[in-house]
Amino acid sequence: MSKCILIVIDSLGVGEAPDAENYGDIGANTFGNVAKANGQLNLPTFEKLGFGAITNINGLKDEVTCSIVGKLAESSKGNDSTTGHWEIGGLITQRDFSVFPKGFPSELIDKISSETGHEFIGNYHASGTEIINELGEEHLSSGKLILYTSGDSVFQIAAHENILSIDDLYKICKISREYCNEYNIGRVIARPFIGDKGNFQRTYDRKDFGITPPGETILSQLFKNGKNSLGIGKISDLFGDEFLSNSIHTEGDKNGLEILISEYEDNRYDFYFINLVDLDMLYGHREDPAGYYEGLKIIDNGLDKLISVLNLSLIHISEPTRPLY
């Protein structure tokens, strides 16, 4: 194999995993349930790739014409993005990251506040879109940063760009990352947003501050064998950039796929690793199956140009037909 493209589509699951009961996910099947919610789907590329043969998806034929398809379950403990990406990259982990359903310890927040000079509001389990609507006005008037978590091991800090610059938000998250290490927190996430009350919107300048993988991955092995790897999207946030030849930020799935196609045609890399986030960020967490279908159409169109070189993988759920919070 001279070149490989690995695409991770955030949240697009094809059925519950064997350990679904541990995470409250019995009955989950994101692709199938989105199809049910929309009547049926018209996704010719996904159909060509054989997704209708993996699980029952209204509108997609149960046949495989140009690919080899299958369904995998994680061997690692945990169901978060970091764990899933690491395992796709060849690193199995046996220790769950810590989660904080009741909020983070006051001593952790006090340490971060003391060093950064910023106070926090929130500190509870919430959807990102919901919490900026709930606390956005208070944040604008007080200057205090919005802190929240989710079902994953994430320490998320949201700030309006008129209150805190993106660079300063990144600096605060980088400091927070150091303190979060001792609490076994998987990711610190910067969540900048814009807009006015009633119309707050998160931007694509999100940045994840993860943990360096504690073992070998496909990226480290390729690097040691003289191969060049390109990370597109949040790959460098989850794996670090030590073994990437280059890393490119994206402004959504359409932009990410356009970058992938352009870079592939330039033929400068051996391994192309991309993460597509819109289904998760824009539609899954907002419980919007109609929007999710529109997002699938964008991906379907982009994949049409890549069928002959795809190594397609899906990771975790944030299913718009199932409440997450």
Report the location of each language-model feature:
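Functional beta-strand-loop-alpha-helix junction segments that form "active/interaction loops"
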Residues: 231-260
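Active-site nucleophile/metal-coordination loop of metallo-enzymes that catalyze phosphate/sulfate
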Residues: 11-160, 164-167, 191, 199
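Extreme N-terminal starter segment of soluble prokaryotic enzymes
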Residues: 1-5
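A long, amphipathic alpha-helix that forms part
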Residues: 258-264, 280-314
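A glycine-rich, aromatic-flanked flexible loop/lid motif
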Residues: 229-241, 267-282
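Single conserved hydrophobic/aromatic residue that forms the stacking wall/gate
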Residues: 315-325
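Active-site regions of oxyanion-processing enzymes, predominantly non-cytosolic
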Residues: 143-146, 186-188, 260-280
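Extended, H/D-rich, highly charged conserved domains that either
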Residues: 159, 167-233
